[in-house]
């Protein structure tokens, strides 16, 4: 991927619309602008221009914005042609730019150039894509915070504190005769504890943001005819799955995404789990267990008239031990019970009626609580973190935990210094201060063309 040539792309979505935008970025765009527009636009002023082809015939007329470097999105000269949003017009404008020496931009290349020219750090650049992809209002707000640098600022504060501690440890290594007293007088233990506390706070906010971005996979499982498909329909507010009195009606996984308080939930209805000689149903049951392996949470539905049966215990025994399970006692309208939540050492159980709707709101609340979402603070203060961010934060947390041990071992300060260095490196990878070219290519390849 070259970074010193001129790139162009249609920056608006495919299809017809009132406005379409062709974006161009590069060095010395004056000649290209004068050729297409007849003259160079005034910087940072919206102007009305004719867009000209190679024969000086008008392709379209629209608004032009010109941002000379370095005061632009990419840090290079940027020209935006705002025309009528028809595919033919947009393609003619883009073709004209390519005729004049620009090349078609690769996905995410405008934002990559912004990163390389230090207009954005890597976390902010990812915030651009996350804002575009946000599916809920809370997710969009979190993405804006990342784009504005709040997540990066928190990471930079951690890195700065780590650097201060590393300087202290490295100085101690250079003057071994001062070793123990020097570390104690500088309160190194307290410094490390403070960093660990702040890291835990950032990790918590990042986990909440990750929930907003990726949502949670919730698998509905249990014996046939306990109300799994009916619950899917009730939560989705639509007749997504076929419901009958015939056991084994659901033969395949049925997926539906919903939103609860801004959190995307990806519901997966599965075939009823039982012993069967039906080949098709057996395949459905195999798919049910495969879906469970990928789940963040399992709802085990049981018939509230009979409670958790021997067959239900057999299902529970096959579930991954670390997987959160919420037992849902359905059909309380038939058993005369009241909707409620029960929690004990065996986990959480909720009693409801899918048919009447009694207890459904309780279920919504418990779903969020089970996955660690704090309703009272919603998305406030959350960072739109990706899986790579969480992995880096968790790796840094583990390294600092090991560093805590070595800090109390005066003859192992070299290992302590290395653990702190690696923790700093892990955190710096989030903002791109320590990042491989392969990772950059993977991140930006998932962006839109034109962004």
UniProtKB/Swiss-Prot annotation:
Binding-site list for (6S)-5-formyl-5,6,7,8-tetrahydrofolate: 23, 80, 119, 451
Amino acids binding K(+): 225, 244, 246, 249
Cofactor: K(+)
Keyword Metal-binding appears in the UniProt entry: yes
Subcellular location: Cytoplasm
Predominant place of localization: cytoplasm
Keyword flag Magnesium: yes
EC number: 3.6.-.-
GO molecular function, one term: metal ion binding
Binding site for Mg(2+): 229, 250
Any single Pfam family the record assigns to this protein: MMR_HSR1
Subunit structure and binding partners: Homodimer. Heterotetramer of two MnmE and two MnmG subunits.
Family listed: Belongs to the TRAFAC class TrmE-Era-EngA-EngB-Septin-like GTPase superfamily. TrmE GTPase family.
Protein's name in the database: tRNA modification GTPase MnmE
This protein's encoding gene: mnmE
